[in-house]
Amino acid sequence: MKERMQKTLAEVKGCPQKDRTESEGYVGVQTFMWICEDNIVEVPFDKEHLLERIISPDNLRKAYKAVLRNKGCSGIDKMSCEQMLPWLLANKDALIRSLLDGSYRPNPVKRVEIPKDNGKMRLLGIPTVIDRLVQQAINQTLTPIYERQFSPRSYGFRPRRGCHDALRGAQKIVDDGYIYVVDLDLERFFDTVSHSKLIEILSHTIKDGRVISLIHKYLRSGVMNKGMFETSEEGTPQGGPLSPLLSNIMLNELDKELTRRGLPFVRYADDSMIFCKSKRAAKRVKESITRFIEGKLHLKVNRDKTIVSYVKGVKYLGYSFYVMKGKCQLTVHAKAKAKMKAKLKELTSRSNGWGYAKRKQKLEEYIKGWVGYYHLANMKRFLIEMDEWLRRRLRMCIWKSWKRVKTKVANLVKCGIDKYQAYLWGNSRLGYWRIAGSYILSRAITNEKLSMAGYATLMGAYIEWHPK
């Protein structure tokens, strides 16, 4: 596979090969390797030759593997990730030549809508797999350059950082006495980024005009929405590998302004919280930082959703905060709890047609994932209550699956219920949910039996994170 990829992504035929003594003349200039079919050629690059670094075979090979690993649906050309390699074998030379001479034109992204928790739709733009390959190559090259510039209080879409780091950072700030929050809400951030402002910010660091031009082409590539082409005058469509990096580059200007003012904050993508020691100070910060965002960055602040509040109960990344004995604690926000319960209800519904094995698998996957994300929260009591509710749901599913009276009676007897009680309950006209909560079904299908059958529990998953 490695040799195949080298042949697929190698380019620059006839590039002159330098010996080691000649390369010593490039003092202070970074180099990369062109892997050709016949030899390895070392080519110098600097800040004005960033494009050569982006399209280097090693970088493109990594980008190819990343796109293949991430999978994802096809773009407007309907090319799948599996079809990418044959296409590259036939068109690699033309692709790299078009990137070098500036004739490369990205395809419009495919509009995809996914529902949000608030009932609205999140708009995604899915690039073609070849555009994803090039975007990924750009992202891999620019990320280490910009990582040196990004704030340590920015956590979204960055290497070795995540939501839990942002939450721990917020806890430390609250522990230092900053107990009032400006919960900043940027209105449709990814859809309203100013292209001219973003290009201006990029130009401060990227001195290779060809790379700036290529990024600009992606920003203005347009959208195919239900077969109709729409221009993209603003925004960085979510869905491509480059969008998260561009959003961080844009909002790094906000980070720098907050740092300059000495204001503690945490930011995960476009989700920011600024902390103050008093409510009056927080209100002043809200007004002044809104002016900066709208005036300098040309972004829109949702004034109705941007709130100033005491830290208790504020929702951030699915968690909420409270202070106990002078220390900031985390709990699961009420909306996240309700969403989890609705999902468990869906997974234990008889209408999905799953058998016992499939239901166990789906429940275990969801429970482990959910508890894995929320394991920072103090939630033992909540999980114990939810486990009781979940076991009742499972008993209801099992009771429903028995269907016929004869089957119900026979299975109750097998589970240790005497024949008379089994006959009474097998013929009962009570609803499924009421019977699932009855003492008879709790005796017949005990917690231990459910556990032995392989049904996962929330507390069981939580104990794996907190063994003591």
Identify the role of each PLM range.
Residues 55, 60, 108-110, 117, ...:
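Core structural elements
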Residues 1-87:
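Non-catalytic, polymerase-adjacent accessory regions of viral genome-replication enzymes
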Residues 73, 83-108:
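Amphipathic alpha-helical blocks
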Residues 98-113, 117, 149-313:
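Conserved polymerase palm-domain catalytic core
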Residues 231-234, 345-359, 370-382, 402, ...:
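Short, solvent-exposed helix-loop connector elements
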Residues 377-400:
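Short secondary-structure subsegments characteristic of cysteine-rich extracellular domains
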Residues 220, 296-362, 366-368:
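A conserved non-catalytic segment of reverse transcriptases
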Residues 393, 402-468:
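Extended C-terminal regions of large enzymes
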